[in-house]
Amino acid sequence: MPKHGKKYLEALKLVDVTRRYSPKEAVELVKKVAHADFDESIDLHIKLNIDPRHADQNVRGTVTLPHGTGRTPRVLVFAVGEAARIAEEAGADYVGSDDLIRQIEGGWLEFDAAIAMADQMGKVGPLGRILGRRGLMPNPRTGTVVRNPEDLPAVIREIKGGRVEFRNDRTGNIHLQIGRKSFTDQQLLENLYVAVDAIARARPQAVKGQFFQSMTIAPTMGPGIPLDVATTVEEARQFVT
């Protein structure tokens, strides 16, 4: 069991682990337990009632957070020719093809999202063993494989404006950044609602019974705040609709 420092243990005293907090209570409390001397990330952790061993129960999608995550993601685009020019003008941080592929194969991963033109996927495909487990592999399901170069600016803008990808891990959990300690309570709350609703809408048909088993929000260095699942899901639905 990991050993925690004095500040963490002091922060933990503020959390009643036997309670399940409402979203409003949780976002207020999570900022109080964020004790580090930097602008900590605030992350949403969800345990899903799925069996990740079955492909038809895996959860994956994207969500555009209304207030972003607190940082501008670095976007890489696999493209050549006119598509590369459009991507550069649209603000992509890295644009290329064979050169970028070689760098990634060599261990370079200094980017947060990757987009590929469809005609590049034959070359990009083998990178799946590197990018897939990090959630960076371009995928048609998440809109990051683009056929028309003229669609690139919209995709790049959306990612830089707060679109994030979510997917379950091998244990059926989803982890998603919903902001930073410096966000207002309302900004965190709205990002939380939009994220939860998007994940709820991504529920696979093969999943039976209750979809969400538990939800927690936590700062980078502090303890988690357990959420009341039913209340959070209902408030998220009402906010989005």
Swiss-Prot record:
InterPro entries: Ribosom_uL1_bac-type, Ribosomal_uL1, Ribosomal_uL1-like, Ribosomal_uL1/biogenesis, Ribosomal_uL1_3-a/b-sand, Ribosomal_uL1_CS
One function term, GO molecular function aspect: tRNA binding
GO BP terms in the entry: regulation of translation; translation
KW RNA-binding (keyword) present: yes
Superkingdom to which the source organism belongs: Bacteria
Disulfide-bond pairs as recorded: none
Record's keyword terms, sorted: Repressor, Ribonucleoprotein, Ribosomal protein, RNA-binding, rRNA-binding, Translation regulation, tRNA-binding
Keyword flag Lipoprotein: no
Gene Ontology cellular component terms for the protein in this record: large ribosomal subunit
Similarity section: Belongs to the universal ribosomal protein uL1 family.
Function: Binds directly to 23S rRNA. The L1 stalk is quite mobile in the ribosome, and is involved in E site tRNA release. Protein L1 is also a translational repressor protein, it controls the translation of the L11 operon by binding to its mRNA.
Assembly and binders: Part of the 50S ribosomal subunit.
PANTHER family found in the cross-reference section: 54S RIBOSOMAL PROTEIN L1, MITOCHONDRIAL, LARGE RIBOSOMAL SUBUNIT PROTEIN UL1M
Protein known as: Large ribosomal subunit protein uL1
Species per Swiss-Prot/TrEMBL record: Thermomicrobium roseum (strain ATCC 27502 / DSM 5159 / P-2)
Lineage: Bacteria, Pseudomonadati, Thermomicrobiota, Thermomicrobia, Thermomicrobiales
